[in-house]
Amino acid sequence: MKKVSFDFDGTLDKKHIQQFAIELINSGVDVYVNTTRFKKFDNSDLFEVVNSLGLSSDKVNFTNHTWKAEFFEDNNLEFEWHLDDNYEEFFHFRRLKSKTKVIQVNSGNWKQKCIRLLNL
């Protein structure tokens, strides 16, 4: 099963991104949420979205303000792609030569890139 990753703030908190995530889930793609948030704080808004997508809490990773590329590497996580709005995250994915492709959600063709990488 193909695995993909979504940032939350500025990405999966948007309705049209949530709709895309639902389409992927319905196509059999394994969807994860990776956020730089701290787990110890109130994340009710995040879990409201996660629950609405039908995802279990084990599909959510809190990096506690560690760069996601470093978190992925340290935890042996690999995804087909990670969708994010933070330009600094892109720098770190490239610096570490991550196998996970990172896609900028603010680019005009982010959805097409995601679909192409999944061969859907």
Spans of model-derived segments:
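N-terminal intrinsically disordered, low-complexity tails enriched in polar/charged
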Residues: 1-5, 117-120
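Alpha-helical substrate-recognition element adjacent to the catalytic core
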Residues: 2-69
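C-terminal cap/substrate-recognition subdomain and adjoining C-terminal extension
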Residues: 43-120
